[in-house]
C-alpha cells in the first residue's frame, strides 16, 4: 500500500491519494503513512526523479515548488499529494475527498467504516466513469473492534462496488463470492524461499503448533494474538 501511494506521488501529476483510519495511531508511528514517507525519502535520496515539496507535514505531503511570476509566487511542479485523515468516529469527514487512490487502513477496527465507504463512493464516480480506486484492508480480532462493517463489505463485494473473488477460503461457500483473503501462511516471515515463494504447508504446521501451545494459557485471549 505504501508503494502504491509513492508511485502516484512521483508519477501521477496532480493526484490526490488518501489514507483514512479510525485512529491516528494507525497512520503514523508504525502505520501506513509512516511507511509511505519512508518510500518517499528513499526515492528522493537514491533516484534521479526526486521531488521538491510544497507541503511537508506529518499527515500531508505535496510535491512541487514555488516560482515567482509577475511578482507573485505560483505553485508549480507535479503537485501530487498524499493525505492521512483520522476520522475519530466521524465518518462524514471523508465527504468531498475524492482521489486516485483511497485506502481504509485497519478496516477491521474502524468504527463507522460502512458509512465512510458509502459517503466516499459517490465522490469516486463521474457519470459512468470511475475516477479512482478504494481499498479497505486489515483484520479484526480485537475485542470490540467493530469488525461487522468489514465483514459486510467482504462478503457482499458487488453491493459495494468491490471486485469479487470466488470464495475458496470458507467451508461450504462454493459458488459464492467475497473479497480477497490473504491467510497467515502467505508471506509469513521465516517461511519464504529464495525466489520469494511462500512455503505455505510448513507455515500452516508452524502456526498450528503455536496455537496448540497457547491452548494451555490461562487467558483465552492469547489465542487471538
List the predicted regions and their residue ranges.
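Phosphate/NTP-binding elements of NTP-utilizing enzymes
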Residues: 1-225
Amino acid at each position: 500500500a505504501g508503494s502504491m501511494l509513492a508511485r502516484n506521488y512521483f508519477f501521477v501529476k496532480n493526484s490526490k491519494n488518501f489514507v483514512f483510519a479510525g485512529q491516528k495511531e494507525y497512520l503514523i508511528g508504525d502505520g501506513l503513512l509512516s511507511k509511505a514517507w519512508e518510500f518517499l525519502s528513499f526515492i528522493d535520496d537514491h533516484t534521479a526523479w526526486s521531488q521538491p515539496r510544497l507541503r511537508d507535514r506529518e499527515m500531508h505531503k505535496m510535491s512541487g515548488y514555488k516560482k515567482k511570476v509577475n511578482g507573485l509566487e505560483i505553485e508549480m511542479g507535479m503537485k501530487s499529494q498524499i493525505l492521512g485523515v483520522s476520522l475519530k468516529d466521524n465518518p462524514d469527514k471523508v465527504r468531498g475527498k475524492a482521489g486516485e487512490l483511497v485506502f481504509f487502513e485497519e478496516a477491521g477496527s474502524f468504527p463507522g467504516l460502512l458509512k465512510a465507504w458509502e459517503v466516499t463512493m459517490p465522490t469516486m464516480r463521474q457519470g459512468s466513469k470511475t475516477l479512482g480506486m478504494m481499498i479497505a484492508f486489515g483484520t479484526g480480532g480485537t475485542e470490540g473492534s467493530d469488525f461487522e462493517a468489514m465483514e459486510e463489505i467482504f462478503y457482499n463485494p458487488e453491493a459495494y462496488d468491490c471486485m469479487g473473488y470466488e470464495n475458496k477460503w470458507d467451508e461450504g461457500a462454493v459458488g459464492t463470492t467475497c473479497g480477497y483473503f490473504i491467510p497467515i501462511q502467505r508471506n509469513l516471515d521465516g517461511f519464504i524461499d529464495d525466489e520469494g515463494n511462500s512455503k505455505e504447508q510448513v507455515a500452516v504446521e508452524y502456526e498450528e503448533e503455536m496455537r496448540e501451545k497457547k491452548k494451555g494459557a490461562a487467558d483465552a485471549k492469547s489465542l487471538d494474538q
